[in-house]
């Protein structure tokens, strides 16, 4: 997180305008500009645990991680700089939350890549903070307005749900596969053996569908779920509760908050961070799994067939198997043996 994103580079063109401002940074915070920009005061709120990790090291308690921002998170701020995410419902959840807390008269800046759909911010905020485009560079747009009316925000209205084979899946904006089970997860689920026992870790759990589907056929497994996303953590908790499944769910940057070892680690790892393609999380997952698997334990992941995971699996575990595949996806299995690097 040392190099600035294109969106931050656009903001830096206006850095003189922010020197006297008390700024709340929010949205898709993929670099540490909130900690480095010269301002009168800076706060940051994020729903992404890995972004909070970076910012909190430099900003301390002025960087906050949660699903819903509170009045304390925006205290004394007179300016919002919002980084538009690729997911419009996610932007609506976050902006309605933040604008319901900030005082009328707050300066509102929205910045984002054109391909992310940032221009739709104008319509979204038209009734609360009419926006005008004030800059365009690096294939990004920067919009400015002033808060004229606070929206009414009710987080409960953003919840959704769908059913998969009789299971109830609870979802929130920003959660992967919010509108239904994705093809990759379906393929991974098809490989899970009924009546499995032991401790299972679901990394990048999303809405929790892998775990509840696994638990239905293997009720004796002991589940732990983690994700970098606050909406995913809350959605997984709700999905487990809706299906009467027990499990521990918490925020973690891959294994950063995970303790202990498991008999099986399952994952449909992400390869996008915001608008950027990133293999870091999956490679960290594969390499770190050996420190969290019992002897004979198994890592089982699904990934797009074109992604270069076989080499990392072989380098880490000594070997791997492809146990299911389609034209687009492969399910990989690697076993913790003496060949595996112990990290």
Curated annotation (Swiss-Prot):
GO BP annotation list: RNA folding; rRNA base methylation; rRNA methylation
UniProt xrefs under CDD domains: AdoMet_MTases
Cited Gene3D superfamilies: Vaccinia Virus protein VP39
Keywords, ordered alphabetically: Cytoplasm, Magnesium, Methyltransferase, rRNA processing, S-adenosyl-L-methionine, Transferase
Documented effect of changing residue 227 to A: Strongly reduces affinity for S-adenosyl-L-methionine. Reduces activity by 87%
GO cellular component, one term: cytosol
Reaction equations catalysed: guanosine(1207) in 16S rRNA + S-adenosyl-L-methionine = N(2)-methylguanosine(1207) in 16S rRNA + S-adenosyl-L-homocysteine + H(+)
Cofactors, names only: Mg(2+)
Function summary: Specifically methylates the guanine in position 1207 of 16S rRNA in the 30S particle.
HAMAP family reported for this sequence: 16SrRNA_methyltr_C
Protein name: Ribosomal RNA small subunit methyltransferase C
Provenance organism: Escherichia coli (strain K12)
């Amino acid at each position: 997180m040392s190099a600035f994103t294109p969106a931050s580079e656009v903001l830096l063109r206006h850095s003189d305008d922010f020197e006297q401002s008390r700024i709340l940074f929010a949205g898709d915070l993929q670099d540490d500009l909130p900690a480095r920009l010269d301002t009168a005061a800076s706060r940051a709120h994020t729903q992404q645990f890995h972004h909070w990790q970076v910012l909190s090291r430099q900003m301390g308690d002025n960087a906050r991680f949660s699903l819903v921002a509170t009045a304390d998170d925006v205290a004394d701020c007179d300016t919002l700089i919002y980084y538009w995410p690729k997911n419009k419902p996610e932007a609506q959840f976050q902006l309605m939350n933040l604008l319901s807390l900030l005082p009328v008269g707050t300066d509102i800046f929205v910045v984002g890549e054109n391909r992310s759909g940032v221009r739709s911010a104008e319509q979204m905020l038209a009734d609360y903070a009419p926006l005008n485009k004030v800059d365009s560079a690096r294939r990004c747009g920067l919009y400015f307005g002033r808060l004229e009316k606070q929206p009414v925000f009710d987080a409960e209205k953003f919840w959704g749900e769908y059913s998969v084979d009789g299971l109830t899946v609870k979802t929130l904006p920003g959660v992967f596969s919010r509108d239904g089970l994705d093809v990759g997860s379906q393929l991974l689920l098809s490989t899970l053996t009924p009546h499995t026992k032991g401790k299972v870790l679901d990394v990048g759990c999303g809405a929790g569908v892998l775990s509840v589907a696994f638990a239905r056929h293997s009720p004796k497994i002991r589940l732990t779920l983690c994700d970098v996303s606050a909406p995913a953590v809350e959605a997984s908790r709700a999905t487990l509760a809706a299906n009467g499944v027990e499990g521990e769910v918490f925020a973690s940057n891959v294994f950063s908050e995970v303790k202990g070892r498991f008999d099986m680690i399952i994952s449909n790892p992400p390869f996008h961070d915001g608008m950027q393609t990133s293999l870091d999380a999956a490679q960290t997952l594969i390499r770190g799994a050996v420190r969290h698997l019992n002897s004979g334990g198994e890592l089982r992941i699904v990934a797009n067939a074109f992604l270069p995971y076989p080499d990392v699996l072989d380098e880490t575990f000594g070997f791997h198997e492809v146990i299911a595949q389609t034209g687009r996806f492969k399910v990989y299995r690697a076993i913790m043996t003496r060949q595996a690097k112990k990290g």
